[in-house]
Every structure is written in C-alpha cells, then in structure tokens.
Design a protein with these regions (language model features):
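Helix-hairpin-helix/helix-loop-helix acidic hairpins
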Residues: 131-180
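Generic structural signal for hydrophobic core residues of well-folded globular domains
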Residues: 78-86, 153, 176-179, 194, ...
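Phosphate-backbone recognition surface of nucleic-acid-processing proteins
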Residues: 194-250
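Structure-specific DNA junction-binding interface
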Residues: 1-136, 308-311
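Active-site-proximal structural scaffolding
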Residues: 71, 165, 169, 207-211
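Helix-hairpin-helix
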Residues: 172-194, 214-215
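Active-site-adjacent structural elements in folded domains
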Residues: 155-163, 171-177, 198-202, 241-249, ...
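Low-complexity, acidic/Ser/Thr- and charged residue-rich accessory regions of DNA metabolism proteins
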Residues: 245-311
Length: 311
C-alpha cells in the first residue's frame, strides 16, 4: 500500500474540520464556522452520516416518531422512505394515507398520489441519491417500478421475515441486493438505515461497501493499494483513526463516545474527492467541479440518535 501523503493527511483534516463546523453550528455559534474557504463556499456532508439532514429526518419521522410499529411495518417504512430519500415525498404520502404501513400500502393508490405530484412539477426523488432507474417491473415511471419492488419484497416474498432473522449486516445486504433496482451501494445504505431501528442490532464494524464517490476518493488518496481492496482501505481508516488524528494534532470531537464507523469512513472518501477538486485541482479526476454551493438552512435541527447507541 502506497499513500499519496498530502491527500491522506487531508482526509483526516477534512473529517476533523467538517465535524468542528457541525459542533459550532450545533452550539449556535455565528458563521463562518471555519477559516477554510472551500468548506465555507461548498456543500459537504457531515463526517458522521447520521448527522446529515435526511438521516435525521429518517430517525425522527420514520423510525422514532413516538408510535409503535411492528417489525415488518418498520422495515417497510424505512425502505419506502429511502427509495425516494426525500422528506417532501414522505409527507405527501403521509397526508394522503392515514399512516405509512403495509396495511395502507396500495401500489395503485400510492402511485396515483405520486403521479399527480409529478404532473404538478414536484420532484419526488432526492437529486443527490443514486437509485437505479430501469423498467424492471415493466412500468415506464421510476416510482411505479419502485412501488412494485416494495410490493414484491413485502407482500409477495415476505422478505421482512428473512431480514429479522439475519445475524449480520452482510446477510441482510445479500438478500436486499438480490432484488432488481437495488445496486450494491444502495443495498448497503438500506441495511445501515435498517440498523438505526430497534428491529435488528447488527455490528457496524464487520461490513462495508465502497460507493462510486468513495472509489474516486480512495484513488486520489492511495497511489497503490497493494493487496488491499477498497473495502480493506475503508477498514484501515476506521482502525487507524485515533492514531492518525493524534499524529496530525487534530482534536476530533466524537459524538458521544462513538468513533467514525465504516460507513462514515466510506462517506468521507466521497467528500474528500469533492474537496480535492478545489484544493488539489491538478490531481487527475473525471470530475472537476463541486456541484453544490453551501446555502445555510434557517430551521435548526434537534439531533437525535438511535437509542441503542446510548448517546
């Protein structure tokens, strides 16, 4: 394994500085929360995936909304939300059906509600999210195929009864990725979100999948991976985080007593790729610009975490 030291050190700097920004905003400090011009100008995900807006919405409105749900309803709710990954789409369905459960799930009715939203010019999918679009179930519209997928998973195959029996994240990942419209990275995101709930309690440090953005980040960070694969590299970062923060004199502020997890280390590679487009433009890359500028949101988020994390 051969590191590109400048980029490797930037990985740890970025993780620490992005977390510092999060903490300062959380404490109500005024902007700018950093002297880093790139972090001031462009939008970057949090160092901890769970602190991102959509993850927080999922926790508060889909999983821990104060109501009791059966395991199968909870799994259904998480997958439905994540296939669209957009708060307004969830709220649209919630306003049209008494609650989002398998009992109220009707492919035609849900589809009709979403179709009229599209005709009114409403976006029902999150732009930043890769969700496979093909006509796997024979429909022209992406949302119809996704609803048909949920119907196959939960009503026809009773996939929920297999998921609750899974002992590891990887077992569940293999079940979910066997379905059409679900790629490896999407399946990894879904099992991570399921693991936020009380339905399962899988270990987080046993399994990871490198997404497209993180592959670009890894390529910039390592000149040669040696005998390691991309997932080994992510695990290497996870296992060496304390040592590296110390080496670089970086005071990384954990949430509770929780270090960065494999999925966080994976995500940081993706953000590092974006950061390097501005910081080190000479590095060879297929993508040369960061698409999104930072726009401050007015409403403050009250952060919550899965109960089992004891934060």
């Amino acid at each position: 394994m051969k590191k590109r030291q400048e980029v490797y050190d930037l990985y740890w700097y970025f993780a620490c500085e992005r977390q510092n920004i999060f903490i300062k905003k959380l404490n109500g400090e005024p902007a700018p929360w950093t002297n880093d011009k790139i972090l001031q100008e462009y939008k970057f995900c949090n160092s901890y995936r769970v602190n991102d807006r959509v993850s927080q919405y999922l926790l508060k409105n889909v999983i821990y909304n104060g109501k009791k749900y059966s395991d199968e309803d909870m799994l259904f709710r998480i997958l439905l939300f994540k296939l669209f990954n957009k708060e307004s789409t969830w709220e649209l369905l919630l306003n049209n059906f008494e609650d989002i459960t398998l009992k109220t799930f009707d492919v035609k009715a849900y589809s009709k509600t979403l179709e009229s939203a599209i005709l009114n010019g409403t976006k029902i999918y999150n732009d930043a999210y890769i969700s496979c679009a093909n006509k796997a179930f024979g429909y022209d519209r992406k949302h119809e195929n996704h609803l048909a997928l949920l119907n196959k998973m939960f009503n026809e195959d009773k996939m929920q009864s297999k998921i609750v029996k899974c002992k590891t994240m990887e077992q569940a990942f293999n079940i979910i990725k066997s379905y059409p419209l679900i790629g490896n990275f999407m399946a990894y995101q879904l099992v991570t979100d399921i693991n936020y709930s009380e339905v399962v309690n899988w270990k987080e440090d046993e399994f990871t999948v490198a997404g497209p953005g993180s592959l670009r980040g890894i390529k910039k960070c390592f000149i040669d991976k040696g005998k390691m694969n991309n997932e080994d590299i992510i695990r290497y970062m996870y296992e060496h985080q304390d040592k590296e923060f110390k080496r670089l004199n970086l005071d990384f502020k954990k949430i509770g007593n929780r270090p960065l997890q494999l999925i966080d280390c994976q995500n940081i590679f993706c953000e590092l790729d974006k950061y390097c487009r501005q910081a080190l433009p000479d590095l060879k890359s297929n993508r040369t610009k960061i698409k999104k500028h930072y726009v401050p949101k007015k409403e403050r988020i009250e952060y919550i975490y899965p109960k089992k994390w004891k934060i």
